[in-house]
């Protein structure tokens, strides 16, 4: 209806799914202040701050020195047999596995990087035969890291 009428609407919601589905422009607020105003696609793919990355979801926030980066949960590869190719893997333990229908959310723990969430298709998960408690190699491409602002 909004698009048919061509009228600007302001829709206040706490449902992220609803906001991302309906909005042509979305505002993420923190403590009464707008911290990012962007299209839903940019909010999800290019969060400006760690708060936005964590609020929108689907990201891990990594700290390296004074800088923070967002890394999408579906950008992390898991290899139960160790590293492959030129990837520089991080060794992690599978802490939890949550089945979500066609996807599987995996919680990993590493002393260097704390907790990581990984999202993969159920097909890929079953091919890899992953289990809770298993030690695995994890990797990602450096171009999948998104630099976050300090605030």
Q: Where does each model-flagged region fall?
A:
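ABC ATPase nucleotide-binding domains
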Residues: 1-48
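Nucleotide phosphate-binding site architecture
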Residues: 35, 41-45, 53, 77, ...
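Asparagine-centered polar/low-complexity signal
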Residues: 30, 60, 87-88
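Residues located in well-ordered beta-strands
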Residues: 39, 51, 91-95
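Non-catalytic connector elements of ABC transporters
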Residues: 68-151
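C-terminal boundary and immediately downstream tail of ABC-type ATPase nucleotide-binding domains
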Residues: 45-66, 71-74
């Amino acid at each position: 209806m909004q698009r048919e009428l061509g009228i600007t609407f302001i829709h206040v919601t706490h449902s992220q799914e609803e906001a991302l589905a309906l909005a042509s422009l979305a505002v993420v607020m923190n403590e009464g202040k707008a911290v990012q105003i962007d299209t839903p696609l940019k909010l999800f793919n290019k969060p400006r701050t760690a708060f936005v990355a964590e609020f929108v979801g689907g990201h891990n926030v990594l700290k390296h020195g004074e800088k923070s980066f967002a890394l999408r949960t579906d950008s992390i590869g898991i290899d139960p047999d160790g590293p492959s190719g030129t990837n520089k893997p991080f060794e992690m333990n599978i802490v939890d596995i949550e089945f979500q229908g066609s996807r599987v959310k995996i919680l990993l723990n590493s002393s260097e990087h704390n907790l990581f969430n990984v999202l993969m298709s159920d097909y890929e998960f079953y091919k890899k035969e992953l289990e809770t408690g298993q030690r695995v190699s994890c990797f990602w491409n450096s171009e999948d890291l998104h630099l976050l602002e300090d605030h």
